[in-house]
């Protein structure tokens, strides 16, 4: 792991647990169109990125622009909380201490990220945050180019199959973390370079191999 100098993190399910407000908001969108709510397990088994693939399956008749507006409205109204996942702040601190560059690449709304990261005390840890990346494969190459970083020295940490596919698309090392939306079985199908239970385990690997 000591060859990696650039750490790209996903947000939802990787650094934070935001499943509460995400599920609440999604269910309110579905209810608005007369659809049944998802249970937590149902949502995790069905949800996928890019968002369009998920909504095309269940609400193909509704324009994405309309869905995004409704989702944002309901998310802002949700009483559900967002929490830092175990090891999140610690791994960001260690990356800073070791002189590594840290980036965010997430589909989260820019304002939601700014609010959540400030409230959770981690907004200052990122060299740059790329938000509203609806298809991360389209964004990761731009991230590498913008910051003049080598894919050989870069890894991407995420909790979903789309994150692993994004890393592979850019030729960077992929880390699947099992604290988020996709199950271990789903992550294994994507064949990441490394699977960890949580960021505490990844931090231990970084500390012992740096």
Question: Where are the regions that the model predicts?
Answer:
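Conserved Lys-Pro-Asp/Glu-containing loop-to-beta segment of HAD-superfamily phosphomonoesterases
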Residues: 6, 138-164
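A short, structured active-site edge motif that brings together acidic residues
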Residues: 42, 122-136
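Short acidic-hydrophobic, aromatic-tinged amphipathic segments that line or gate anion-handling sites
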Residues: 130-131, 194-198
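N-terminal helical cap/lid subdomain that shapes the substrate entry/recognition surface
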Residues: 2-89
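Surface-exposed amphipathic alpha-helices with a cationic face
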Residues: 89-97, 144, 164-168
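Conserved phosphate-coupling serine/threonine residues in phosphotransfer and NTP-handling enzymes
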Residues: 14, 106-108
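Acidic, Mg2+-coordinating phosphoryl-transfer loop and its flanking beta/alpha structural elements
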Residues: 156-194
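Short, acidic loop-to-helix structural element flanking the phosphoryl-transfer center
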Residues: 77-104, 114
């Amino acid at each position: 792991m000591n060859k990696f100098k650039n750490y790209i993190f996903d947000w939802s399910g990787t650094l934070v647990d935001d499943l509460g407000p995400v599920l609440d908001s999604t269910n309110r969108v579905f209810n608005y169109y007369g659809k049944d709510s998802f249970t937590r397990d149902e949502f995790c088994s069905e949800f996928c990125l890019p968002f369009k693939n998920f909504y095309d399956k269940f609400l193909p008749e509704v324009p994405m622009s309309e869905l995004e507006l409704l989702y944002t409205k309901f998310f802002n109204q949700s009483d559900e909380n967002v929490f830092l996942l175990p090891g999140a702040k610690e791994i960001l601190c260690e990356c800073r201490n070791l002189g590594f560059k840290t980036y965010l690449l997430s589909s989260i709304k820019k304002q939601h990220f700014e609010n959540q990261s400030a409230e959770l005390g981690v907004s200052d840890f990122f060299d740059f945050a790329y938000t509203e990346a609806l298809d991360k494969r389209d964004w990761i190459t731009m991230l590498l180019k913008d910051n003049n970083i080598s894919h050989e020295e870069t890894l991407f940490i995420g909790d979903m199959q789309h994150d692993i596919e994004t890393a592979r698309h850019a030729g960077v090392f992929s880390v699947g973390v099992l604290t988020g939306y996709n199950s271990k079985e789903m992550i294994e199908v994507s064949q990441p370079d490394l699977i960890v239970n949580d960021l505490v385990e990844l931090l231990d690997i970084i500390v012992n191999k740096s």
